[in-house]
Amino acid sequence: LQKKIVKKRPGTVGICAGIQNKYSVDAIPHILCGGFTKEDTENLLIDLDFLGIDNVVALRGDALKNETYFKPEKEGNEYASELVTQISNLNNGIYLDEDLKNSAKTNFCIGVAGYPEKHMEAPSLDSDIHFLKEKIRNGADYIITQMFFDNKKFFDFVEKCRTAGITVPIIPGLKPIATKKQLNLIPHRFSVELPDDLIMAVVKAKDNDHVKQIGIEWCLQQSKELVAAGLPVLHYYSMGKAENVKAI
């Protein structure tokens, strides 16, 4: 016999409601295409709206670990652009059931993902920006970028977006490196490049405590440059290492 340990914890709605009600901090749940039918998504959004959680980020989600490409749920949204449309429709009082009598309008502010070094499945950055523009046309209000470690990539991306006619705010996404393993993990998993100077510094580090400090200092310098350039908001990917972000 094998003992099964089950750890119970609140779901997304419960956690977000707790954050807002207990700490008066706006929660921004990620709404995914993967694993949800359109009906599931609508029900989730109705709950969030009722609780006053009106900021969301619409994402497609990744392929499952044992699959090579993303497969949408049957009767679910296949692309983030479709998910944005569904949320935007609710903002206009348009529900899946057109005959619904209590179809009150929601008031979601919708964020989407952008990729300064292009999405790993996109053939080029230009084509990726084309699809990003579609998400904006469908109702997205702002963009949060994938992590990057060279600020020039972010500034070039913003310039390309503006040239393409994208005018919504673009929030830079940052991640402090914390371990030597991440030198291989981050480029492979997120399809981003690490600057040579950062790689060499991490390779020479005597242990992960030293790596952690290098990652904090690198990310802090990025942050200072971005703020100096006029960016009003920065987004940090903690990925279970909140103390690193807190140090920054």
Feature map (PLM): residue ranges:
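Catalytic cores of alpha/beta
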Residues: T37-D49, S127-F131, D156-E159, T179-L185, ...
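Flexible, glycine-rich active-site loops centered on histidine and acidic residues
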Residues: K38-Q86
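Short, acidic/polar
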Residues: K38-L45, P123-E134, G215-E225
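Short, well-ordered coil/turn segments that N-cap beta-strands
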Residues: Y23-A27, G52-D54, T106-F108, A140-D141, ...
